[in-house]
A protein has these predicted regions:
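C-terminal boundary of histidine-terminating zinc-finger modules
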Residues: 216-235
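C-terminal alpha-helix
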Residues: 234-242
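Short, hinge-like loop/turn segments at secondary-structure boundaries
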Residues: 51-55, 166-167, 192-195, 220-223
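Conserved catalytic-core segment of NTP-binding enzymes
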Residues: 107-205, 213-214
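Walker A/P-loop NTP-binding active-site region of P-loop NTPases
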Residues: 3-69, 123
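Acidic-aromatic/histidine active-site loop/patch
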Residues: 1-3, 241
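P-loop/Walker-type NTP enzyme "switch/lid" segment
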Residues: 40-116, 216-218
Length: 242
């Protein structure tokens, strides 16, 4: 099993959108894929699959607090694909509780091992909370690869430098994904500058898309609804490179 974390230093850069679409593409290619929402502060993945789960259904929060086995959290959002989703709780009380965690986050390590043994996945994708904190470092430590998602602005650049350094100290391979870039940006030049500045590869670059932004307002998977779009082709290339 290859564990891939999607992370960003700042919120709102499209990290969850990338995670959901990549998980779908990997599963559509026949790869057994688990997508786990470890962004306990602001969970979002259920929206992309338009799941209507009962609020009492177990989530990752329940596993981390010892209230439920991790295997009971797994759901299959698209029945004809080998894709499994482990959602985080969207209950307001649980999101507030996550700000002052009362559980041992190292329990996640045991959960990952149990998922590997029970489901034998090819890929486990972790949609991580943005920023630098104890939970993000723990999640990074279980990964083989980190996709650090950023936008083309100074604050993103500074924060990304920090996160790339953390990944290297944890001996986890970092790759960059530039998202929502202005349409007039010279992407080849920016790619060269990013790779030189951070000394790591740029795995993909995506320009701003009004179509994707509009879909984000109602939910759904962009690559599933727009398989021939240019962004979908770049997402497919990124998925194949993993």
């Amino acid at each position: 099993m290859k564990v891939i974390g999607l992370h960003s230093f700042r919120r709102g850069v499209g990290k969850s959108t990338l995670a959901a679409n990549l998980a779908y593409l990997l599963a559509a290619a026949g790869k057994r894929t688990i997508l786990m929402d470890v962004n306990l502060y602001s969970p979002a993945l259920e929206i992309f699959f338009k799941l209507k789960r009962d609020l009492s259904a177990p989530t990752l929060n329940d596993y981390l607090s010892g209230a439920s086995p991790i295997t009971e959290l797994v759901c299959q959002p698209i029945l004809d694909l080998p894709l499994h989703l482990i959602p985080a709780s969207s209950r307001t009380a649980d999101m507030i509780s996550a700000l002052r965690p009362s559980w041992d986050m190292t329990v996640l390590l045991n959960g990952v091992a149990e998922l590997d043994a029970s489901l034998n996945p090819d890929y486990l994708l972790l949609d991580m909370a943005s920023g630098l904190h104890e939970e993000s470092i723990l999640c990074m430590s279980v990964c083989n690869l980190i996709l650090e998602v950023l936008r083309a602005d100074a604050q993103n650049y500074q924060g990304t430098a920090i996160m790339v350094g953390v990944a290297r100290r944890l001996q986890v391979e970092p790759r960059l994904v530039l998202n929502d870039a202005p349409l007039d940006l010279d992407l080849p030049v920016v790619r060269q500058r990013l790779e030189k500045a951070y000394d790591c590869p740029v795995a993909a670059m995506f320009t701003h898309s009004d179509q994707m932004m509009a879909l984000g307002a109602v939910g759904g998977l962009f690559v599933r609804q727009n398989p021939d779009a240019e962004i979908s082709q770049r997402l497919k290339e990124l998925a194949a490179s993993l």
